[in-house]
């Protein structure tokens, strides 16, 4: 049970994505009261990976082999950056 006003944000994990595929992550799991927040995500290099947000879900699309930073900004003022690595082969859950 979550006690109102308690808790702390968790670290959003780095991700692996295969070229031409997508991987989803529910951001609400990583921020206190996450289901009540809004999220904005940006990719440092959209030629490597693009990112979109639908509700609490972040979708990362692998464009070409390489690595880039994805920045997650949250309506409560929190911000985290992760590394997304795109490889020719990775499975659909982000693991190699």
Give the ranges of each region predicted by the language model.
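Extracytoplasmic soluble-region selector
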Residues: 1-96
């Amino acid at each position: 049970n979550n006690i109102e006003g308690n808790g702390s944000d968790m670290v959003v994990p780095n991700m692996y994505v295969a070229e031409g595929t997508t991987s989803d992550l529910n951001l609400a799991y990583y921020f206190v009261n996450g289901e009540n927040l809004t999220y904005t995500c940006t990719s440092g290099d959209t030629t490597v990976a693009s990112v979109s947000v639908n509700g609490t879900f972040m979708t990362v699309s692998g464009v070409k082999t390489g690595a880039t930073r994805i920045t997650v900004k949250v309506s409560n003022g929190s911000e985290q950056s992760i590394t997304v690595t795109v490889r020719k082969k990775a499975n659909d859950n982000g693991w190699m």
